Amino acid sequence: MITAPVAATPAKAASPSTLYQRICLGYSVSAVSISLDEAVDLARTGDVWLFRGHAMADRAIQLATNSPVNHVGMSVAIEDLPPLMWHAELGRALPDVWTGTRHRGVQLHDLREAVIVWAARYGQRAWLRQLDPVVTGEMEDAALATIARLDGTPFPSTARLASRWLAGRAPTRTRQGGGADLETAYCAQLLAVTYQAMGLLPGSRRPGRYDPGSFWSGDNLGLSAGFRLGGEIAVHLPAGGARMPHTPAAPG
């Protein structure tokens, strides 16, 4: 169980609405920092999670995709279900909520547990970007349909990841949107395909053109239908971390 760190002078926690107002006002990353508990309370479908690590595998992905971050995922918060994380990774530390099994590649995880694994076990810094306005029921249905179609898709090798990123930037006369099934999927491509299905990104752009850094505020993502992502919110775990799953896994 995650507990808030003990402070010498307890301060009243900001409500989710107050936190969101601060984010929309454009506070910098250093000015907005919240606990994992607060981040989970804020979770809405379509919110983006960004991770940056310093291990060799993390740096390889950053170099291969020319990105300042090495992993990206999306919050899924549907009705009475606990908040979930939709992403693609090499690890299999957590059971996939959709299938009930542990596997590599495209996965749907408990949001809190996924952030704990990435921040505490893999040594990653975590940031949250909230999507505004709230998505519609039809957009949530499109996200769930994408989850049903792509959950379990394998994660590509680092070499294939780099080649796909380069291919995504090559000019083409053929429209390649997010409708086609994927043989493999890395995290940013998965998020792009899901956003395209939800109508948040144009379907005319290749999903392979996106890398984790495309979803960082320093890039011009250009969402559709008047949607926007707020600034990065640094998310911190409580002092002492949390108990990790026992299954060995490697980040991706």
Identify what each model region corresponds to.
Residues 1-252:
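Cysteine-nucleophile amide-bond enzymes
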